[in-house]
Amino acid sequence: MAFTRALSRRLTLMLSAGALLAAMLLCWAALQKHETTLEIRAVSQGATIPDGFSVWHHLDANGIRFKSITPQDDILLIKFDTSDQSEAARKVLYRSLPRGFVIAQQEEKSLTPAWLTRLRHDIQRLG
């Protein structure tokens, strides 16, 4: 009897510790900063994208911090630490760049949104 009581107590403690660890991991994952990326591309075919230095100058003049500015094919990618910085930069660049450019938030390449979408569709098939 004492053996089963001790085993039950240990099992309860181990399950509680596991649940606490899982909750801590979920909280940690939710609090992680996810970088955001703005894309600048020309509307018309053959037009050139603005150079990174001029974009840097406009962002720096408005106190907006960024991680990197990278040209890629016909797109200029600007990475930020937060979505607030990205949104502020988008507003500044719409005001300061000449017309003829599209400034858009780049789609997240994380597997999590696709996984959640797939999970939602699978739940609808149940029952």
Curated annotation (Swiss-Prot):
Quaternary data: Interacts with EnvZ.
Domain of life where this protein originates: Bacteria
Similarity-based family: Belongs to the MzrA family.
Protein known as: Modulator protein MzrA
Ranges that cross the membrane: 11-31
GO molecular function terms attached to this record: protein kinase binding
UniProt xrefs under InterPro entries: Modulator_MzrA, SecD-TM
Main localization (coarse): membrane
Keywords, sorted A to Z: Cell inner membrane, Cell membrane, Membrane, Transmembrane, Transmembrane helix
Function statement: Modulates the activity of the EnvZ/OmpR two-component regulatory system, probably by directly modulating EnvZ enzymatic activity and increasing stability of phosphorylated OmpR.
Cell compartments where the protein resides: Cell inner membrane
Cytoplasmic side: 1-10
